[in-house]
Amino acid sequence: MPAAVATGVQFGGPPKNKKIVFDDSGEAVVKQNKKEHPQRPKFEGKEQVKKPQKIKFGEDGKAKGAKSFNKNHQKPDFANKPQRIKFGDDGEQVASKSFNQNHKNGPKPQKIKFGEDREAVHQKPFNKNNHKHNGQKSDFANKPQKIKFTDDGEDEVTANSSNTKTEPTKKSQKIKFGDDGESKENFKKPQRIKFDEDGAGKNVSDSDGDSDEELGDSISKKHNKYQSKIDEDEESQKKWYHVHPDYPSTDEVLDMKENDQLELYNLCKNSFEAEKITFNKRNPSDARWLQTALHKGTAKDRANAGALLVTSNPLGNLEALSTLIGFCKISNKASNDVIAVLTDLWQEVLLPPNRKLLAVHTRGADWKKLKKDENLRNEQKRRIYAYWHFESELKDQYHEFLKNVMQGLQTGQEHNKNSSIVSAARLLAYAPEKEQLLLTMLVNKLGDPIAKIASKALHHLSEVAQKHPNMCGVIVAEAEKLLFRNNISERAQHFALCFLSSIAPSGRPEVCTKLVNICFALFKVLVQKGAVNNRTMQAILRCLQKAIVEAKPAKDSNGELLTKEMQDTIYRLVHLADIRVAVQTLGLLLQLVAVKTEKSDRFYNALYVKLLDLNLINVGSKTAAHLLHIVHRAIHIDNHVARAQAFVKRLLQLTLYAPPHIAAGCLIVIHKLLRMRRELIGGTGASEEVEEGSKVVLPISADLDKFGSDDEEVYEDVKDEADDTKDSNPLEEKADNDVKSSASSWHHARVAATEAKVRDIDSCKYDPYHRVPAFAGAAYALRHELLLLRQHYHPTVQVFAEQILQQSRIDYYGDPLRDFGLPHFLERFAFKNPKKLEASQAAENATVAHKRYMAHGARGRPVKSLTKANCTEDEMFIFNFLEHKRRQAEIVAQNKKQKEIKKDAAEEGDDGEAGEEYLKEGEVDDDEFEAYLDGYFGKKFKEGVDEEQDEEELNFLQELGGEIKKDKSKDKKKKKQSDKAEDEMDDIDDDWGDDDLAEDEDDEIEGEDQSDDETGSIDLQPLDDDDDDDDDDDDEGSISEGGPGDSDSSDAPESPDEEDDDDEDAPPRSKKSRKDSTDMVGGRSFAKTLKQSHDMSSLFAAADDFSSLLEETAKVKGQGTSNAVFNKDKSSDKQLKWEENRRSNSKSYKGKKFAGKPAAKGGRPQKAGKKRKH
């Protein structure tokens, strides 16, 4: 049987023809490519196929004239388009015409049909209604057909498959072969081909029910697999607590039986183990390396590696999280770093911010709902159970982490406590999980013995309360437990109260009411103990001031926060307690008057009396600022004009004797009050309404002449009324006066009712000692204090007083208590540039900004930049001082230059006239004054100063004696050398002569601060001399301390034994003090003083002391020499040399030993050149 050749062409890809040759038995033979078998002949008896040939079948079914393709399967050049085979009615191949793309000429191409004998059989053409080409290519032309072969090489099934995509509007047809080898035409629906396990094809009909079910199952499995993959991708992108937001479904906790809890726990655990493989697939590519780094390397690297693992895949790395928590123990040196890393991990990855973590046994309601939900697949339910198990394990791990943090807080060092406090505060502010445990930890740290730790806990607790105002009630309840513990310390109570006062403004009314009750309870406890002058009382009053604004009174208190007994106690504190406590109490009373509309008379009377307290001049700037704020606010809200004028008068009186900064503050307060309340200006400015309330009725008409003309009309009515009721009953007159007089609670100036003449207090004149400001009569007094303040010694006070008198505006916006205080004034002489605030510091709250206050304007500029134009009145003193120093420096420089000119002129013979002319111009010809200037300005000006030197380059520190420190160091060096030289000398006379203890001649500034004793005077009886200056008593070492057995320790020692006893019992003193004491009582110091002193006045002052020395040494042999002064015990020169050699050979010998210094271990202090008595 002739072989049939079929050609399959693949479109849409590279042009490649595949050739299949069938032998006589009908089997297909695969020919090798020519390129793979180059040894075969090129044509091998057949012609080269240049163009695919059509197969023609005869009547016997055999193909005629079939030419084979190229054996090497090489792509022919003309094989770009496949050729179709056309058969006639008799089954023979008909000569085919050229293929028309539009299919308009000739019938459509036919498909090849094979019979049972594997021979091609005639096939009818396609029906036009079934398949329309519309001038396009057929489906099987667009997509080539593949023929699959079984193991025996026979072609069994042909299915349409292609590696390339066809056009979307075309669909290829599948060919189905039956048992007879014929293909059944079915153009409406493509046929399915199913393959067995051995690869053989099996015919499947569409009507087979089993195949439809299997198809549905396979489709559903593929869909479920695809959906699961999508779900996994979505879960990996979300945080774990956002994957199933429906659970927990309710806040209700359903009680479960023990069996149900165990069943649910096992179910969740098994589900988690089943899903663990899926969870592990989410690990990053370097997960294995991170696992290695978690157990090897430094502590910080291990912590970071574990954090990366947990961050990338929390559900698959619970073991890594457990390992990290183990690193947080206090025994680990790097626990602080691990705690910080884990805190970030809990905050950013693991903890849900809006709910608590749930354990498995609390999932009863969710489990019940999940079992009833039929929309979820079993796989989804299993995953939900796995998440429940993970959350339960995470809750346990978090509790273990907090245990380690608590251990660091309780038993750790300071750095451990700091890191633990920061971690606990961050977690408490972020999530509600374990908030009670975290809050207890932080509140307990308020009682830490280290003040820094307690302050840090207070700060972080305040931040938590500000972020979560709703937590204030819980925080206050926990702080209350701390305050009322039995073993609580005063420091812990102070920090707890400071914390409560910081959160009081942000609390709600019920929280403020609770704070008020706590403070009042603690207030009673402290009053009973008598501890009212401490910091705790101040903290209580400060907390009450802030909390009482929003507090609500109790239902059974008649609308009052304070009981009568409590009010009396508080007012007693104003008069009896310390000035700081009294000021805090006044602030509390002002809050009650301003906010709760309490009776104001008693408060104003207490404040008015407190302004006379002499302790106000010694208070700090903080207390003074608080007091001025209270006074300003009290006067501002007071509607009683006469009372307000009395307070203004009292403030002016305080200004006269107060320090400059408090005086300036009082004047600023008065200035603001007078500008806001114009009726307070002048001696009388009371309004008619207020005067009627404060008016006092005088029954005696003779006293009415004391009133001024301004109030004549008002008091004429009083006069008429008094005349009408002159002869009336005194009791009735008293009743009328009660109605018209002031209702002040402290105004009790009434005579007895039986007295005929009833007279009230005369308020027509000013009474500075009146206890009630409303009746002090300040409206009738002139404010002559302002005239005195114009002559105040502080220039700023003068300016402020002048501006108040002229009713002009005071343009000052700084803090007078800081700018005009003594510390600021002295700091300006230090010539330091002011500190510059950073941007972060400038943006802080008002409390911190007040502590870092810097002066504004000219007061905040460097001293060198001051000019006469921008200098303020209080800085003018410094400016003039510097200008004076500059002028002196210029005079010294000019004088030095002129000296050189004078010297040159003297050499030329013009000596006299030039010198006289210079002296007349410079007006400085005193050599002593020049030496004084040289010594004052230091060595810089001794050598001369360049006249053209810029003023900005002047070193003011050197001008003020900056070389003193260098001179002192040189003096010390000289003294050490002299001490060493003295040790090597054998004779006292040589010792005196060879000693070079010359001091610097320019040390005059240092000498000004020294007493007479330090400049060379010998004071043998410093305590008995009543005429000594106070500075002598303050100098170190000026008082010699005697032993306990001495009757008079101030007397000078009369013998070496007494001196030794005194020195032995005296406490150890510094080198300077020992040196001073030696210089005062030792004869050697007198010799040094004689040699180094340049001030002869000090020598005359010590003449009496020197004469007493001569009298004491009158009986000594060899008198008239210096040895008689230094050798009072009459020791020989041999004895002195032996003692000196003995001391020099001892181990503890460090040079020349003077009086008061120990000679050796356990020995008594020895005097140089003195013999011990045996």
UniProtKB/Swiss-Prot annotation:
Protein name in the entry: Nucleolar complex protein 1
Ranges annotated as spanning the membrane: none
Stretches with biased composition (Polar residues): 95-104
Bias (Low complexity): 1156-1166
Presence of keyword Nucleus: yes
Family (UniProt): Belongs to the CBF/MAK21 family.
Keywords for the protein's UniProt record, in alphabetical order: Nucleus
PANTHER family given in the database record: CCAAT-BINDING FACTOR-RELATED, CCAAT_ENHANCER-BINDING PROTEIN ZETA
UniProt feature, compositional bias: Acidic residues: 207-216, 715-724, 907-916, 945-954, 981-1038, 1048-1065
Reported phenotype of the disruption mutant: Larval lethal between first and second instar with reduced larval size. Conditional RNAi-mediated knock-down in proliferating cells of the eye and antenna imaginal discs is viable but results in small eye size and disorganized ommatidia, possibly due to excessive apoptosis. Conditional RNAi-mediated knock-down in cells of the prothoracic gland impedes pupation, probably due to reduced ecdysone hormone levels. Conditional RNAi-mediated knock-down in fat body cells delays larval development, induces dyslipidemia, and is lethal between late third instar and pupal stages.
Localization, UniProt: Nucleus, Nucleolus
